[in-house]
């Protein structure tokens, strides 16, 4: 068995961030009466949020903004799309979002089944996530994922972000693993795939949405059940 340790990303890989965020944002839309403020319809509000969230996460990954800026500025920029320049409202929406998002528990299809399968085969299962420490732990507990992982490495605990090599080195040390017997599984081409490749680690691109890329990960899958063909 070449691999002994499997390091998973969480958001967009196992935990369905977009689906869970949509539910949470629907609640925010209603709670803050955004329709009455001119933020309408929700069908426009939601894609604007996803757009700005992606941009700001990318900036956060590169160290251009802080986690706190990411949290409220994604709301702020979304409101600006509707000509609402209300920083106080954006920060209140952000705080409420961070409170309700982690209790959502939608996972990608067959997440639990594949984790059961891998655990049964005695692989060491771990997480490497750029998500916020408290939030990620809540997501894991509320979705029933926490018992599967021996080590949960967050950017806050390691003081480093994927794709930086330091977070992968920290993960190896924490798990007592070696790059040669470990593999990274994730959806983000920059953070997970480039990060692992630059660290000298094999990787699996979990390509749920069929993104094209010139990168050459060790494996590419479009569905978690395909891991049964690898391990």
Task: Name every feature range the model reports, one short phrase each.
Residues 1-6, 19, 116-119, 128, ...:
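Asp-based, Mg2+/Mn2+-dependent phosphohydrolase catalytic module
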Residues 2-108:
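N-terminal helical cap/lid subdomain that shapes the substrate entry/recognition surface
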